[in-house]
């Protein structure tokens, strides 16, 4: 197989792991594109993206245009004369002229089994919706949002213990392997593009802090899915004792209860059991303001008076 001349475009750690796989392959990464350096940390010091840091470590040229819509940036990219451009969590829109520049076009690594969960938050929405599996799709890019022809798909079961954080790690391992496999198929012509079924498509909207507020009028199962989807960001929470209390881990039971939604049924070392519109939510790990996440047993030792049976979390204390 003749090595491909690759432009890699990506920004966060998830992208850097794919770049590392390409560096370790027989292909030639001739340039990287990544977001401009951003202020980070307490000192707001300009910080390079993980992709830039890795590229510099391997002496790969780095380009950081604010946009790829202007002719100068497009000409700069065309002059690289790449065979293919690989895009993983880059963060900039690629206009059609850029998509058409490399000989084999541009391909993208997307964290879902397309056409399900197109858009910004596919990993989180799979958990939020209660999906039983997720995966990675290697896709030929077009001008739509994750609408291009599919080149390769992998599948990953979603476990009851999975959170967005754990799925992110699993897909960050699965994605690079799938990408290298897809490049082999593209090079030897064995990979056949498959169109997406538009009737199965849906959109993975970005998460918001407001959406992370626990609504006890939902079912216990849905709240359990929310808590897993919103870990590690924005983290599910409820308000009680004039405090925002984050919930990191929970379980649920479909067993019906007579108490009003939001009522504490029991508070023990095993967890805080709360009535919902359908079933019971059992909170296992919480975080009080300005504190670290702790097991419920430790929180009850310090704030047991906040979480007694019969207290309704829908009613804030004065």
From Swiss-Prot:
SUPFAM superfamilies given in the database record: FMT C-terminal domain-like, Formyltransferase
Q: Keywords for this entry?
A: Protein biosynthesis, Transferase
The superkingdom of the source organism is Bacteria
Chain sites annotated for binding (6S)-5,6,7,8-tetrahydrofolate? 112-115
GO CC entries: cytosol
The main enzyme category here is transferase
Question: What molecular functions are annotated in GO for this chain?
Answer: methionyl-tRNA formyltransferase activity
As recorded in UniProt, its EC number(s) are: 2.1.2.9
Q: What is catalyzed by this enzyme?
A: L-methionyl-tRNA(fMet) + (6R)-10-formyltetrahydrofolate = N-formyl-L-methionyl-tRNA(fMet) + (6S)-5,6,7,8-tetrahydrofolate + H(+)
InterPro entries annotated for this entry? Answer: Fmt (IPR005794), Formyl_trans_C (IPR005793), Formyl_trans_C_sf (IPR037022), Formyl_transf_N (IPR002376), Formyl_transf_N_sf (IPR036477), Formyl_transferase-like_C_sf (IPR011034), GART_AS (IPR001555), Met-tRNA-FMT_C (IPR044135)
Recorded family membership: Belongs to the Fmt family.
Q: What function is annotated for this protein?
A: Attaches a formyl group to the free amino group of methionyl-tRNA(fMet). The formyl group appears to play a dual role in the initiator identity of N-formylmethionyl-tRNA by promoting its recognition by IF2 and preventing the misappropriation of this tRNA by the elongation apparatus.
Instruction: Read off the NCBIfam families from this record.
Output: fmt
What this protein is called in its record is Methionyl-tRNA formyltransferase
């Amino acid at each position: 197989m003749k090595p491909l001349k690759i432009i890699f475009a990506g920004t966060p750690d998830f992208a850097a792991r794919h770049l590392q796989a390409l560096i370790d392959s027989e292909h030639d990464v001739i340039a990287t594109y990544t977001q401009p350096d951003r202020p980070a940390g307490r000192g707001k010091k300009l910080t390079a993206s993980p992709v830039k840091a890795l590229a510099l470590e391997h002496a790969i040229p780095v380009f950081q245009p604010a946009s790829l819509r202007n002719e100068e940036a497009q000409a700069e990219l065309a002059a690289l004369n790449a065979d293919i451009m690989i895009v993983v969590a880059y963060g900039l829109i690629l206009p059609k002229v850029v998509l058409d520049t490399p000989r084999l076009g541009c391909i993208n690594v997307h964290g879902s089994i397309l056409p399900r969960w197109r858009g910004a938050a596919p990993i989180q929405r799979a958990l939020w919706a209660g999906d039983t599996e997720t995966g990675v799709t290697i896709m030929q890019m077009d001008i739509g949002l994750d609408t291009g022809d599919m080149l390769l798909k992998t599948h990953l079961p979603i476990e009851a213990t999975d959170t967005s954080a754990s799925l992110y790690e699993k897909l960050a391992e699965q994605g690079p392997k799938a990408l290298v496999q897809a490049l082999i198929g593209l090079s030897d012509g064995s990979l056949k593009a498959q169109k997406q079924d538009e009737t199965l498509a849906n959109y993975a909207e970005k998460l918001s802090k407001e959406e992370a507020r626990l609504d006890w009028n939902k079912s216990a199962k849905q709240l359990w899915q929310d808590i897993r989807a919103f870990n590690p960001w924005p983290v599910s929470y409820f308000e009680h004792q004039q405090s925002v209390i984050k919930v990191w881990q929970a379980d649920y039971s479909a067993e019906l209860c007579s108490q009003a939604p939001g009522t504490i049924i029991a508070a023990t070392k095993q967890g805080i059991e709360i009535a919902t519109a359908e079933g019971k939510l059992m909170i296992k790990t919480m975080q009080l303001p300005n504190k670290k996440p702790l097991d419920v047993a430790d929180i009850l030792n310090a704030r047991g008076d906040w979480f007694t049976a019969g207290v309704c979390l829908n009613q804030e204390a004065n």
